[in-house]
Amino acid sequence: YGINTVQVHKNVTATNCPGDNFPFDQIANETGESKPSKEKGKIATIQTSLNEKYGLNISIDNIYGNETKKALVKGLQTELNKQFGSKLAVDGIFGTNTYNACINVRRGAKKNITWIIQSMLICTLFNINADGIFGPATESAVREFQKRNGLLQDGIVGKNTFNKLFK
């Protein structure tokens, strides 16, 4: 943008805003680069849990990328096989067979499929917890996700919502 310096408003004109306690020096010296912690953060926690729950070996880098997405799909496929006898290939690809095996998940659901949904919502920038309990916060995040993606806003994760989450 061609901006070389940033000045405090009160140094340019007489004013009391934004106040002496405003962290101007800290903000003005920021590089604007994201520096994720490799071992801390919600995505790192999700990555660690995926490795532990599903015997995977993905990098713990606190970055949501293809490796983490594929691992979440593998987790979903594993759970659909275990809980519903879906006989899916656990390949990390959200294809037609995985889509067809998806079930409706709604408020009150508990455990691993709910945890996977919550984890995917976190990875798509929703500020919720991945506790495996489909409560009001998860339902609200699902409704907002559905709204952003042009889906019916019913708070139920069905085939179409799974498809948008995992494609």
Go through each PLM region and give its residues.
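Short acidic, glycine/serine/threonine-rich helix-capping segments at coil-helix boundaries
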Residues: 35-42, 48-167
